[in-house]
């Protein structure tokens, strides 16, 4: 990452086929926050929603969770995420960092459950909190690099 990328907003995504969790954070501070969930089943609808978020937040870069199997091998969603990352980078002309997202949804679900958030409300928030965990992992990795 260049010196120019030490400040600015970051938007992170936990990509799903129906819902995509979104988190935000500031590079200088390194703390991630859940932001919203995009309800969209098509890539075009998802990109339109991201277009609005990007216009509002003016991100310096994007972080995208890279789903893999438990052993780290790739699956169909890995390919979907890689294609989505290329599309993001092309459309917004911002770098996209891919971050291992193994267990983020399960961890997010556990954290929400521990706070007494269950059912449909939990399902909606799980993706945004998973995006937060992905982004926080990105920030934490920058500190140890």
UniProtKB/Swiss-Prot annotation:
Keyword Nuclease among record annotations? yes
One Pfam match, given by its short name, reads RuvX
GO biological process terms, alphabetically, are: rRNA 5'-end processing
GO cellular component, alphabetical, reads: cytosol
The UniProt record lists the keyword Nuclease: yes
Tell me the Gene3D superfamilies matching this sequence: YqgF/RNase H-like domain
The molecular function GO annotations come to: nuclease activity
> What family is it from?
Belongs to the YqgF nuclease family.
Functional summary from the UniProt entry = Could be a nuclease involved in processing of the 5'-end of pre-16S rRNA.
Name of protein: Putative pre-16S rRNA nuclease
Q: Which organism is it from?
A: Thiobacillus denitrificans (strain ATCC 25259 / T1)
